[in-house]
């Protein structure tokens, strides 16, 4: 791609959208794109895609700028922000479904749904700033994944702009397109490499009447994981998070591992279920605003400062042993087989590579996998953020990319195997 191609593309996009809708990148966006376009509808996105294909200009959806800023080592030419596409298209309270544009943040959507006693129970860190498109593209989920699942579990429809500016829809009665792809599963976690998500439909849940949080200390990680497993068998928990000592200290439990679990329901249900929580040694129970504050702190828990942070996924029964064998600081979504692990302090490149290799070896031994979430700037370009899948799987993924994006304009080099 030449500078002339970029200049032609920028001029064409300014004419299509208006000069005020094309701007310089802000903060994290500068690590993702050289300029940013802010379309107001799917038709404008389609026009942008056609320009990019004609001029061979790469574009990146910027809803997940925080995630992309970690993965992408060099910015693409054009970032597409969906901040102006933030409308609720349809909300059916009786059916407990909602359709919304991809630029709407999860926080804004849930404030509107709360008027009807409903919510979309997905809870990534920083949900107030997390756009729905980013939620899907990066497959983000938090503590509530234990009870409510991940975006893939609540998504019932998706609309996106793909190759040649075509608008494609899947969901409802149209579960698969004519090529046989399950579009909802394909687009969730695709990191913007197959198209630009413009609209999504979700099933909703009622807001719980009451909420009780339990925090219990443990001398050993294995004891905390065993207690979490017993609780998961006994109760319909909202979440069951196990924290290593560095993170447990932020909740007032220094030098120990902590299990933070929660239940929800009406008053009689909560009182009945509290009996199982009280059986934990040293447990403290919290209700009302204090319980809510604990959950919010848990949801938005950050690892910073960390040289490397990664997400580990194994079978639920293997998670505790795998995390212990790694020996890093961690937060684990017990019962789900998912944990985030991190290495604090400073580390050189050789040490970083050795650490990541050791983490990945432990994940493979537990029949799991590991993805780097963040790394210090000096390390970021030198590390493989994704595990290498088996050759047959990678070949299938490349074929999927070629079918959806033959021109290679959608966020290239930002996924598994450089896809």
Locate each region found by the language model.
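Short, surface-exposed ligand-recognition loops at beta-strand->loop->(often short) alpha-helix junctions
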Residues: 2-4, 215-223, 268, 309-321, ...
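FAD-binding subdomain of flavoenzyme oxidoreductases
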Residues: 115, 120-123, 127-240
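Glycine-rich N-terminal segment of FAD-binding domains in flavoprotein oxidoreductases
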Residues: 25-91, 98-102, 107-110, 114-122
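N-terminal accessory segments
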Residues: 1-32, 51-66, 285, 363-388
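A generic structural motif
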Residues: 35, 79, 251-264, 336-345
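A conserved active-site cap/scaffold subdomain adjacent to cofactor or substrate pockets
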Residues: 217, 227-286
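Structured catalytic cores of enzymes that bind and process phosphorylated ligands/cofactors
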Residues: 22-23, 29-31, 39-41, 61, ...
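Conserved glycine-rich FAD pyrophosphate-binding loop
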Residues: 40, 57-58, 69-77, 81-83, ...
């Amino acid at each position: 791609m030449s500078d002339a191609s970029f200049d032609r593309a920028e001029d064409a996009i300014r004419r299509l959208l208006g000069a005020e809708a094309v701007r310089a990148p802000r903060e994290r966006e500068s690590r993702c794109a050289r300029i940013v376009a802010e379309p107001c509808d799917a038709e404008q996105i389609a026009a942008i895609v056609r320009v990019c294909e004609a001029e061979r200009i790469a574009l990146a959806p910027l809803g997940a700028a925080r995630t992309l800023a970690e993965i992408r080592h060099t910015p693409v030419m054009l970032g597409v922000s969906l901040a102006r596409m933030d409308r609720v298209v349809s909300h059916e309270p009786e059916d407990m479904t909602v359709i919304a544009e991809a630029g709407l943040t999860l926080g804004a959507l849930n404030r509107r749904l709360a008027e009807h006693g409903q919510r979309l129970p997905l809870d990534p860190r920083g949900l107030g700033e997390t756009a729905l498109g980013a939620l899907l593209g990066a497959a983000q989920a938090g503590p509530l994944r234990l009870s409510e699942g991940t975006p893939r579990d609540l998504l019932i429809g998706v609309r996106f702009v793909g190759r040649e500016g075509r608008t494609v829809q899947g969901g409802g009665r149209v579960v698969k397109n004519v090529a046989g792809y399950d579009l909802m599963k394909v687009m969730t976690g695709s990191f913007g490499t197959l198209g630009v998500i413009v609209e999504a439909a979700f099933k909703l849940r009622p807001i719980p009447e009451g909420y009780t949080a339990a925090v219990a200390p443990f001398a050993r990680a294995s004891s905390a994981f065993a207690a979490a497993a017993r609780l998961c068998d006994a109760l319909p928990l909202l979440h069951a998070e196990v924290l290593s000592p560095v993170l447990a200290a932020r909740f007032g439990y220094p030098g120990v591992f902590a299990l933070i679990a929660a239940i929800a329901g009406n008053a009689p249900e909560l009182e009945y279920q509290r009996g199982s929580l009280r059986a934990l040694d040293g447990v403290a129970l919290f209700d009302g605003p204090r319980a809510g504050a604990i959950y919010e702190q848990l949801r938005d828990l950050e690892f910073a400062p960390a040289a490397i942070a990664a997400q580990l996924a194994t079978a639920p029964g293997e998670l505790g042993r795998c995390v212990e064998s790694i020996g890093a600081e961690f937060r684990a979504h017990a019962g789900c087989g998912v944990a985030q692990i991190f290495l604090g302090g400073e580390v050189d490149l050789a040490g970083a590579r050795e650490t990541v290799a050791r983490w990945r070896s432990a994940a493979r031994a537990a029949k799991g996998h590991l993805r780097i979430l963040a790394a210090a700037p000096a390390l970021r370009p030198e590390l493989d953020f994704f595990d290498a899948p088996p050759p047959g799987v990678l070949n299938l993924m490349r074929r999927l990319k070629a079918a959806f994006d033959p021109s290679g304009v959608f966020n290239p080099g930002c996924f598994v195997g450089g896809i």
